[in-house]
Amino acid sequence: MSYGLMIAVQFDRQDIFDRLWRWGTKYMQHQEGPLKGYFAWSCKTDGTRNSQGPASDGELYYVTALIFASNRWGNDTGINYLAEAQNILNCSMEKDGTNRVMPFINVEHKLITFVPDIHGGRFTDPSYHVPAFYEVWARWANDGRADFWRECAERSREYLHKSIHPVTGLNPDYNNYDGSLLGNNRIIGDAFRFDSWRVPMNIALDYSWTCADKEWQQEYGNKIQDFLYSQGIDTFVDQYNVDGTQVKDTLRAGEHKALRHSLGLVATSAAASLMCTHEKSREFVDKLWNAKHEPYEDGYFDAYYDGLLRLFAFMHLSGNYRIIFPEK
């Protein structure tokens, strides 16, 4: 839902944005109780919640999309977008662990949590880190926390440095706030899997919006493309250990456990070309351009994740994923 809001505001589709927002507040957002202000992370199309709990990256995108909506359309057309963004931030930052619910930004580490509760608040997810979003909040959220959000942006960039393997450019799905592996011996956690695909695209976004960490980001972009290229630009798979070795266990997507040359990773590795300085970056863009969004050989089709990452990558590479400044 929060991805849909971001896409709608980027394409100046207020009609779609408002319909999505109203549906989300009706069926997904908690209006009272310990989770007030947060959104259930998954719902059926009839509004039934698959889970009550939030996923912190959802709130990250909700807030940023609402601020952009405020900048683009103002706040007097039926929805006060800025007030809604501030409400999410205020509701979150007022939480203190009561009923096991926490802010979605860990206030000690100034880093986003995996889930804003007592368990999920102990660690983070590299793919949730979009430092440029905090810069947007610092500039336009008007919630009295501008300095805090700027520090969150800096901490997030520092954290990413620690989370990326120095040779392969790969990162784990989840890790500790200091960038170290969880070491939990579970299939999801220490390896580069589905969540991790988003990291190249997110770092490219920070590069293109802020240029606050330019040299490291260029090195990172070259590094991860070099690794994937070494695996075969048409054959690299979607799950690796962070050192580039083959995973012992394959995470299931669809009915079959299979390593695939997934469109989602084809897309985000192409988006990384925004910050790359080597010639092979053009090949990654060409591969995305010519890739088809269709079922894999085993019949699995991912409309949601592959589809949205493909769209976001095209938005990045075409110059249509931008900071939206206030209308004058």
Regions inferred by a protein language model and the residue ranges of each:
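Extended ligand-binding clefts on enzyme/binding-domain cores
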Residues: 36-37, 51-57, 79-267, 274-282, ...
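N-terminal carbohydrate-binding/catalytic regions of secreted carbohydrate-active enzymes
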Residues: 1-59, 65, 72-75, 195-196, ...
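Alpha-helical scaffold elements that line and support the substrate/ligand-binding pocket
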Residues: 5, 63-71, 130-138
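Aromatic-rich peripheral "rim/lid" segments of glycoside hydrolase catalytic domains that contact
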Residues: 314-328
